[in-house]
């Protein structure tokens, strides 16, 4: 993916991989070390870029490289 990622694209990817109902629950509950021990939701709220947060989520979920 080139360029910055919008928050809406981040959530579209989350919905695609985890389902719309579960994506928010997962993002609110999974603490990821690479996000300074924050959940994805906390990291986004703290101002981390959606692209950086997606990379950490991608690694945690062990998604195939094509979904990067």
Q: What kind of region is each of these model predictions?
A:
Residues 1-68:
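C-terminal alpha-helical interaction appendages
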């Amino acid at each position: 993916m080139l360029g910055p990622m919008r928050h809406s694209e981040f959530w579209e990817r989350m919905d695609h991989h985890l389902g719309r109902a579960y994506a928010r629950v997962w993002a609110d509950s999974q603490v990821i070390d690479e996000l300074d021990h924050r959940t994805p939701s906390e990291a986004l709220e703290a101002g981390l870029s959606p692209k950086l947060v997606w990379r950490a989520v991608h690694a945690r979920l062990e998604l195939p490289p094509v979904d990067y």
